C-alpha cells in the first residue's frame, strides 16, 4: 500500500477519532492533488469541510487549484477569495502570486471590471512591470481607449516598456490623440535605443 492506500484504509476505521479523520482527509486532498487526481482531491477536501467546525487556508487553496486544473474557473474563484480573506484574517501576508492567480481567473472569466480593480491594487502594492502592462490590457478589453493609452503612457514613464510593438503603439496612439510631439519623441527614442527596428516603415512613422 502506498501513502494514499494507507490513508484510505484509515478512514474505514469506524471508531477513528474526529481529529485523526480530519487530518487524514486533508492529507488525502493533498496527496491526490500531487497525483493530479483532481476529482478525488476535491472529494476529500469537501469531506473535510463537512466535518470540520472551522475553515482552513490549505483546504480553500487546494479546492481552488483542483477546480482550476479542471478548467472549472467559476468554481475555483470563490474558494480562492475565501483563501485570501481567511489568510488576511489570520494575519498572513499575501504575495503577488496570490493576487496574480486571482487576476488570471478574472481574465479567463472575462470579468474585466474586477480585473481592473485588482490590477490597480496590485500596482499600488507591488509596483511590478507586469501589472502596469496588464492595466493597459484591461482597459483595451473594456474598450476604454483613452484610459488604455494613459495606462500605456504611465507604463512608459515608469520605464517598463522595452519592446517595439508597445513603443510604436504608444507613439502612434498619442499622435492620434492630438499629442503628436510626444508621440514622435517616444518613437524617436525607441529608434535611438534600438528598441524599434530602423526600417523604412518605422522611419516613415517617425517622420509623420
What are these regions (language model features)?
Residues 1-208:
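Alpha-solenoid helical repeat scaffolds
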Amino acid at each position: 500500500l502506498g501513502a494514499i492506500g494507507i490513508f484510505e484504509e484509515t478512514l474505514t476505521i469506524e471508531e477513528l477519532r474526529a481529529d485523526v479523520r480530519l487530518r487524514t482527509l486533508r492529507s488525502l486532498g493533498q496527496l491526490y492533488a500531487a497525483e493530479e487526481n483532481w476529482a478525488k482531491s476535491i472529494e476529500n477536501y469537501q469531506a473535510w469541510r463537512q466535518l470540520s467546525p472551522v475553515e482552513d487556508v490549505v483546504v480553500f487553496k487546494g479546492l481552488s487549484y483542483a477546480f482550476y486544473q479542471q478548467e472549472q474557473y467559476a468554481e475555483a474563484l470563490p474558494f480562492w477569495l475565501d483563501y485570501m480573506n481567511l489568510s488576511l484574517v489570520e494575519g498572513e501576508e499575501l504575495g503577488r502570486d496570490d493576487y496574480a492567480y486571482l487576476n488570471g481567473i478574472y481574465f479567463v472569466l472575462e470579468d474585466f471590471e474586477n480585473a481592473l480593480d485588482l490590477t490597480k491594487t496590485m500596482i499600488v502594492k507591488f509596483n511590478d512591470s507586469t501589472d502596469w502592462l496588464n492595466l493597459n490590457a484591461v482597459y483595451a478589453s473594456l474598450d476604454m481607449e483613452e484610459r488604455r493609452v494613459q495606462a500605456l503612457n504611465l507604463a512608459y514613464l515608469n520605464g517598463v516598456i522595452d519592446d517595439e510593438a508597445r513603443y510604436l503603439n504608444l507613439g502612434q496612439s498619442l499622435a492620434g490623440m492630438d499629442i503628436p510631439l510626444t508621440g514622435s519623441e517616444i518613437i524617436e527614442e525607441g529608434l535611438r535605443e534600438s528598441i524599434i527596428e530602423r526600417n523604412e516603415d518605422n522611419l516613415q512613422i517617425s517622420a509623420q
